[in-house]
Design a protein with these regions (language model features):
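A short, Trp-centered hydrophobic/proline-enriched beta-strand micro-motif
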Residues: 170-178
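Buried hydrophobic positions in well-ordered alpha/beta secondary-structure cores of metabolic enzymes
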Residues: 62, 73, 102, 109, ...
């Protein structure tokens, strides 16, 4: 007979026998430590370090990805995290290190510079980075998910060819601009506007609490489109690039958490976004 969690009736009986024996021994004045050293106990079926037996469900390739990510994180990130957290110090070379190992944009196809892994592998990478610090995981996951995935899923072929390979290597750093200072992450209340003009859009607005923005080269931002007639249309995504006139990204200092990763604003003061980046 087996219980639903895999524990046999014999193991349960052994546990109960031991429990009642301990109570009897305590009544006789036998020290607790002496009792447990001399009494065999049933082996626990629960594995605290893998409670859902995840490892048994992984493929060999997924285990290899996990182990490679774990080795890098423990060796390279673990050595940096205390200094980074204490002093709000972000090291941009981390992106290039991760890129060299294929840890950025894991699900991006090989033709655009990614390793073409599945989402299980991506989750395993994120978990290993998170073991060290949420700030480092934020750096990696913003680049991999919020920046690279929208470009890969919804961008033009030219946009994919231009942005994804350099984001995958970490040569370029990306950020994702949705949250605003007065409206949080509520898209319906979004105040940022993209005014249609000849050859592109004029971007006006502010984003807040944006991971990676002060060191970013690529800005995936969201705005409500305004037609040339003045009608406010749907929300659209735009890809802005470092150096565009009117684009700035001041840093936010004094955070309580995520101190190992840099956070900032995105300020768009009549930034011209060409049609090919919309």
């Amino acid at each position: 007979f087996m219980w639903s969690d895999g524990v046999s009736i014999n193991e349960v009986s052994s546990y109960l026998d031991a429990k009642f024996s301990f109570a009897a021994a305590a009544g006789r004045g036998v020290p607790c430590g002496q009792f447990f050293r001399s009494t065999p106990m049933a082996k626990a079926a629960f594995q605290w370090n893998d409670p859902f037996l995840l490892d048994q469900q992984l493929s060999d390739d997924e285990r290899m990805v996990r182990d490679a990510a774990a080795a890098y994180c423990q060796d390279r990130l673990g050595a940096r995290v205390l200094e980074a957290f204490r002093h709000e110090k972000t090291d941009p070379t981390i992106f290039r290190e991760m890129g060299a190992l294929g840890l950025l944009g894991p699900t991006i196809p090989e033709q655009y510079g990614g390793p073409g892994l599945n989402y299980v592998a991506y989750g395993l990478i994120a978990r290993e980075v998170e073991r060290i610090d949420s700030g480092y995981r934020s750096m990696m996951s913003v680049q991999s998910s919020l920046v690279m995935v929208p470009i890969n899923e919804f961008g033009s072929e030219a946009q994919k060819q231009k942005f994804l390979p350099k984001l995958a290597t970490g040569e370029w750093i990306g950020c994702f601009g949705l949250t605003e200072p007065d409206h949080g992450s509520d898209p319906n209340s979004m105040a940022t506007r993209a005014y249609k003009t000849a050859g592109g859009y004029r971007m006006v607005g502010n984003k807040m609490w944006i991971s990676n923005s002060p060191i970013a080269d690529v800005f995936v931002v969201w705005a409500k489109e305004v037609s040339e007639s003045g009608a406010v249309g749907p929300i659209r995504g735009f890809v802005l690039e470092k150096g565009m006139k009117g684009l700035s990204a001041p840093a936010v200092h004094g955070k309580v958490g995520l101190r190992a990763s840099i956070t900032g604003e995105i300020v768009m003061d009549n930034v011209f976004c060409p049609e090919e980046n919309a």
